[in-house]
Amino acid sequence: MQPIHEYGRHITRRHFFAQGSHALGWAALASLLGPDRLAVPAAASAAADKPNLAHFPGKAKHIIYLHMVGGPSQMDLYDYKPVMQEYYDKDLPESIRMGQRLTTMTSGQKRFPIAPSKYKFAQHGQCGMWVGELLPWTAKMVDDMCFVRSMHTEAINHEPAITYIQTGNMNTGRPCLGAWMSYGLGSLNEDLPAFVVLVAQPTNTEQVQAISARLWSSGYLPGEHAGVSFRSAGDPILYINNPPGVPAEVRRRTLDGLKTLNEINFQALHDPETQTRIAQYELAFRMQASVPDLTNLASEPESTFGLYGEQARKPGTFANTALLCRRLVERGVRFVQVYHNNWDTHSNVAGRLPDQCRDVDQACYGLIQDLKQRGMLDSTLVIWGGEFGRTIYSQGGLSKENYGRDHHPRCFTIWMAGGGVKGGTIHGETDDFSYNIVADPVHLRDFHATILHLLGFDHERFTVKYQGLDQRLTGVEPARVIKELLA
């Protein structure tokens, strides 16, 4: 019997209202580990205690997902379009636009003047990948990377677009990719979560986007598979230290008493989320020892900071976050989700994009090289990209030195490295305007299917029953594994 049905058999009207009357108390206790998960619906969790649900041996055992929030400008970084120099300030042809949907921010513009990239490009590596001058460190490792220049999505605004690429659906309430991985493969370290979220602080904060905790929700999967968010300043997790005057043994006895009460509650109601809560409190207690060790960089040699850059010493920076990614994966964390904000360049590309690239360029190089030197890259899939791309036409004013770019869902670039992808691969092609895909399109569903394949899952069979349906990350529409990307 599914746990949700078992729960329904035991719950009574009195129990229902008793649960509601204790909501504030539960919310306060939940701060031991992070965002409250009591509202997470119970789901099919019969397999949740199994360590591995994979259908075949996967190449990737860990994922580090570096999400550039806002949508990086592909034609300023990776999608070289030299012919656009001849089109400066000319209107984007209607034959290219084809009446496609625009955001409300530019749909009222009388003109759509083309803004060629002001940055120089050069070819790098044996693969000959064109990389913009703002990413000199990334350019050094293109033969270790797999570039997809033909990603596309239907979502044109940030909230649905980020939700879509993280959960496979534009609607909220679905499990994210990290939760699916935790559910399917389980944890490798009982002292750390299987899924950790890090939010890096950008140097430039001109136009940051909201980053909601629902992006690392477990949705209809058991609550234990939700991401645990580490803070970028102060204690990584609230209440990681005991309150003044409360020794560890008192904290231990308190949790033991709480566990007893929760077990009594479970015997009465058979709510599977009660067991999840017990496990979360126990993990929180163990993290009091494991997390300070994780975040203490004193043991790192000077060569580490030479690799990642001096900013790696400063908590909250992208470079520091990248170093923590390696330390987390090294300790067995399955999925590390990083969010780096302020890539939403509606204006002032010249003033903002260089800062963004400086934040991430050397740090990404350091992360890939560090994993490679330690023999971890083959089993760790690193993903870099945003939720959509940018337009070739300028939003607002245009000059030779500066311009803005609106959202563009019909083509954008991501890259991956390690974890079973083929280094030195350049997949997909866009037209001369970087506006439409002309070869080898990759939809988000294909992207998700490929990631699941690298983890050892057949995306059509990796399902969980919820609300009478077999739910899956890739949904019900067609999706395929992009085999050209696989090593």
For each feature predicted by the language model, list its residue ranges.
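Ligand-binding pockets and gating/stacking loops
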Residues: 1-487
